[in-house]
Amino acid sequence: RTKISTYLTIPCGNQSLCVDRVVSDNTGRLSSVFVGGVYPLFRGASNRVLLAFASPQFQSSYLNSLELSEEEKTQLKEDLKGARARGYDITHNRLTEGLFAVGFPIYNSANQLVAGLSVGGVDDSERPDVVEKYIQQGRQLAVEINNQMGSNYYSRISD
């Protein structure tokens, strides 16, 4: 519907599982994310949003399990904090070189985090208007899905 690539992931232990994807013609050949694929939570927008909106206890345990430098862990913590404050995460070249994505949390009727939704396309840092379009379209999709799931998450936050 958005004519951009869309991915849906769910938490799967300390990783995420891609359960659905719709890829556009311009990103399909580049995408390294496939239905049934398992991915690290700290790479890719639909994965990182699962980590950003997870409980502080889970985040801490997960971050401590990563084999990253302290500097990388500190940067990741700041990125996750920013994503949570914005209500979405944005990544450039994190999971697939040449692509960017914007990830949004999906909640169920009990307002429990159940999935991550990302929309993305070819990375063009010279066109911030394109990124903003993806943010708006992704947010609209996330709101619709959350509403259909019975969640009031997006009615509780401001744009």
Mark where each language-model region is.
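Amphipathic alpha-helical effector-binding/dimerization core
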Residues: 1-62
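Sparse recognition of residues in long alpha-helices and their boundaries
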Residues: 24, 35, 126-127, 153-154
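A general structural signal marking secondary-structure boundaries and capping sites
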Residues: 54-57, 87, 149
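Short, hydrophobic secondary-structure boundary micro-motifs
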Residues: 61-63, 92, 154-155
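Short histidine-centered catalytic/ligand-binding loop motif
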Residues: 63-69
